């Protein structure tokens, strides 16, 4: 039972195809208010920054490896914020003269590599040595190493000297 036919195809099939042709995420994003758009943008920036986290068995140090192909080391920032949160942020930029500016530059036919700001936050354990955080950038991978604090030495019992009342005081001098 078909309701009507458009160009030889059932109306329902035409409507379904039109829905599939829409780029819904972009259409929905355009209708969001600016603070919500900023939130969506930041969540995408976090989701599009892949990171591996591993713990070294010998030392207990944490090693975070973040893929950052095409990012200049000067555009990367690593900081410890809000106590024990490691924040990695930066920006991936298009090469100079490679913009789609309508001039003599470049006209992109397909853009699949994401450009723009990126950010990742990682909560560090209480045992992390925040003064010993190191970062190294090589071959498009940022490696951040966070050493583990040595365990605190067990408290030794403190010996308290016991004084004997009245011993060593001359007799006859009372209070």
Swiss-Prot record:
Start and end residues of each sHSP domain: 42-165
Cellular location(s): Cytoplasm
Renumbered residue ranges of the record's region Disordered: 145-175
GO-annotated biological processes: protein complex oligomerization; protein folding; response to heat; response to hydrogen peroxide; response to salt stress
Endpoints of the signal sequence: none
Keywords: Cytoplasm, Stress response
Residue ranges, compositional bias (Basic and acidic residues): 146-161
One of the Pfam families matching this protein, by short name: HSP20
Family: Belongs to the small heat shock protein (HSP20) family.
Subunit structure: May form oligomeric structures.
Protein's name according to its UniProt entry: 19.0 kDa class II heat shock protein
Organism classification: Eukaryota, Viridiplantae, Streptophyta, Embryophyta, Tracheophyta
